[in-house]
Amino acid sequence: MKAIHWTIAATAFAFVQPTLASAATTDPEVIIYRFNGVRGLLGSAAPGTVFHCTNFSGANEMIRFVSRTQSGEIAGNHVLPISHLQTVTIVYGNIITYSVDLHLTLPSALTFQGSIAIAATSANMFCTAMVMETAEFAPVGIALRGIRFNPVPGSQE
Protein backbone atom coordinates (compact mmCIF):
# COMPACT_ATOMS: atom_id res chain seq x y z
CA MET A 1 0.00 0.00 0.00
CA LYS A 2 2.85 2.38 0.82
CA ALA A 3 4.37 1.74 -2.60
CA ILE A 4 1.14 2.86 -4.27
CA HIS A 5 1.05 6.08 -2.21
CA TRP A 6 4.69 6.84 -3.05
CA THR A 7 4.04 6.20 -6.74
CA ILE A 8 1.06 8.57 -6.73
CA ALA A 9 3.07 11.26 -4.91
CA ALA A 10 6.01 10.92 -7.34
CA THR A 11 3.66 11.17 -10.32
CA ALA A 12 2.03 14.30 -8.89
CA PHE A 13 5.43 15.95 -8.38
CA ALA A 14 6.45 15.10 -11.96
CA PHE A 15 3.54 17.11 -13.36
CA VAL A 16 4.01 20.20 -11.20
CA GLN A 17 5.62 22.98 -13.25
CA PRO A 18 7.50 25.91 -11.72
CA THR A 19 5.89 29.27 -12.50
CA LEU A 20 7.11 32.84 -12.39
CA ALA A 21 5.76 35.13 -9.74
CA SER A 22 2.62 36.98 -10.70
CA ALA A 23 3.02 40.44 -12.18
CA ALA A 24 3.55 43.09 -9.56
CA THR A 25 2.86 46.21 -11.58
CA THR A 26 0.07 47.21 -9.19
CA ASP A 27 2.21 46.98 -6.05
CA PRO A 28 2.97 50.25 -4.24
CA GLU A 29 6.15 52.03 -5.30
CA VAL A 30 9.16 52.25 -2.99
CA ILE A 31 12.14 54.55 -3.50
CA ILE A 32 15.17 52.42 -4.32
CA TYR A 33 17.83 55.00 -5.30
CA ARG A 34 18.72 58.68 -5.25
CA PHE A 35 21.47 60.11 -7.44
CA ASN A 36 22.79 63.67 -7.36
CA GLY A 37 25.00 65.30 -9.96
CA VAL A 38 22.49 64.47 -12.71
CA ARG A 39 23.03 66.68 -15.72
CA GLY A 40 21.56 67.21 -19.16
CA LEU A 41 21.15 69.81 -21.88
CA LEU A 42 18.73 68.66 -24.54
CA GLY A 43 19.72 69.27 -28.14
CA SER A 44 23.35 69.92 -27.22
CA ALA A 45 26.70 68.16 -27.26
CA ALA A 46 27.12 68.92 -23.54
CA PRO A 47 27.51 65.94 -21.20
CA GLY A 48 24.34 64.05 -20.31
CA THR A 49 23.38 61.39 -17.76
CA VAL A 50 22.63 57.74 -18.48
CA PHE A 51 20.90 55.30 -16.09
CA HIS A 52 20.87 51.50 -16.41
CA CYS A 53 18.39 49.50 -14.30
CA THR A 54 17.84 45.72 -14.17
CA ASN A 55 14.84 43.92 -12.67
CA PHE A 56 15.43 40.59 -10.92
CA SER A 57 12.14 40.36 -9.02
CA GLY A 58 10.69 37.46 -11.00
CA ALA A 59 7.76 39.59 -12.22
CA ASN A 60 6.98 42.54 -14.46
CA GLU A 61 7.43 45.80 -12.54
CA MET A 62 7.10 49.56 -13.02
CA ILE A 63 10.04 51.91 -12.50
CA ARG A 64 9.69 55.68 -11.99
CA PHE A 65 12.25 58.49 -12.42
CA VAL A 66 11.51 61.77 -10.62
CA SER A 67 14.07 64.49 -11.31
CA ARG A 68 14.55 67.68 -9.31
CA THR A 69 16.40 70.89 -10.14
CA GLN A 70 19.16 72.41 -8.00
CA SER A 71 16.50 74.34 -6.10
CA GLY A 72 14.42 71.20 -5.44
CA GLU A 73 11.60 71.80 -7.92
CA ILE A 74 10.30 68.75 -9.79
CA ALA A 75 11.67 68.82 -13.33
CA GLY A 76 10.27 65.52 -14.60
CA ASN A 77 8.30 62.42 -13.65
CA HIS A 78 8.56 59.41 -15.99
CA VAL A 79 7.36 55.79 -15.63
CA LEU A 80 8.58 52.77 -17.57
CA PRO A 81 7.51 49.08 -17.43
CA ILE A 82 10.37 46.63 -16.92
CA SER A 83 10.20 42.84 -17.35
CA HIS A 84 11.97 40.21 -15.26
CA LEU A 85 15.75 40.23 -15.99
CA GLN A 86 15.35 43.12 -18.44
CA THR A 87 17.85 45.98 -18.39
CA VAL A 88 16.55 49.40 -19.41
CA THR A 89 18.59 52.46 -20.37
CA ILE A 90 17.27 55.92 -19.55
CA VAL A 91 19.05 59.14 -20.57
CA TYR A 92 19.11 62.91 -20.19
CA GLY A 93 20.81 64.43 -23.21
CA ASN A 94 21.88 63.02 -26.57
CA ILE A 95 23.71 59.89 -25.43
CA ILE A 96 24.59 57.75 -28.48
CA THR A 97 26.76 55.13 -26.75
CA TYR A 98 23.80 52.92 -25.74
CA SER A 99 20.45 52.03 -27.22
CA VAL A 100 17.90 53.99 -25.20
CA ASP A 101 14.55 52.81 -23.78
CA LEU A 102 13.44 56.21 -22.46
CA HIS A 103 14.62 59.78 -23.09
CA LEU A 104 13.88 61.88 -20.02
CA THR A 105 12.40 65.19 -21.06
CA LEU A 106 12.60 68.58 -19.43
CA PRO A 107 9.93 71.28 -19.22
CA SER A 108 12.28 73.67 -21.05
CA ALA A 109 15.48 73.49 -23.09
CA LEU A 110 17.53 74.91 -20.24
CA THR A 111 20.45 73.09 -18.73
CA PHE A 112 19.31 70.61 -16.13
CA GLN A 113 21.47 70.01 -13.10
CA GLY A 114 20.10 68.34 -10.01
CA SER A 115 19.09 64.98 -8.60
CA ILE A 116 16.87 62.05 -9.44
CA ALA A 117 14.90 59.59 -7.32
CA ILE A 118 14.24 56.13 -8.72
CA ALA A 119 11.20 54.30 -7.37
CA ALA A 120 9.82 50.90 -8.38
CA THR A 121 7.11 48.43 -7.51
CA SER A 122 9.84 46.11 -6.16
CA ALA A 123 13.12 46.63 -4.33
CA ASN A 124 14.54 43.73 -6.35
CA MET A 125 16.23 45.98 -8.89
CA PHE A 126 19.62 47.59 -9.20
CA CYS A 127 20.59 50.76 -11.05
CA THR A 128 23.77 52.59 -12.03
CA ALA A 129 24.28 56.10 -13.39
CA MET A 130 27.00 57.94 -15.31
CA VAL A 131 27.55 61.46 -16.59
CA MET A 132 28.84 60.93 -20.12
CA GLU A 133 30.03 62.78 -23.18
CA THR A 134 27.12 62.78 -25.60
CA ALA A 135 28.90 62.63 -28.96
CA GLU A 136 31.07 59.59 -28.19
CA PHE A 137 30.47 56.00 -29.33
CA ALA A 138 32.74 54.72 -26.55
CA PRO A 139 31.58 55.29 -22.96
CA VAL A 140 33.53 58.36 -21.77
CA GLY A 141 32.42 59.78 -18.44
CA ILE A 142 32.26 59.37 -14.69
CA ALA A 143 30.10 57.16 -12.49
CA LEU A 144 27.62 58.73 -10.09
CA ARG A 145 27.25 57.27 -6.63
CA GLY A 146 23.68 56.27 -5.91
CA ILE A 147 22.31 56.10 -2.39
CA ARG A 148 20.33 52.88 -1.96
CA PHE A 149 17.00 52.94 -0.11
CA ASN A 150 15.00 49.79 0.72
CA PRO A 151 17.75 47.22 0.07
CA VAL A 152 16.93 43.72 -1.09
CA PRO A 153 16.14 41.57 1.99
CA GLY A 154 19.15 39.53 3.07
CA SER A 155 21.66 41.60 1.09
CA GLN A 156 24.46 43.95 2.06
CA GLU A 157 25.12 47.02 -0.07
Residue map of PLM features:
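C-terminal segment of classical bacterial N-terminal signal peptides
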Residues: 13-21
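Enrichment for repetitive, rod-forming helical segments
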Residues: 9-12, 152
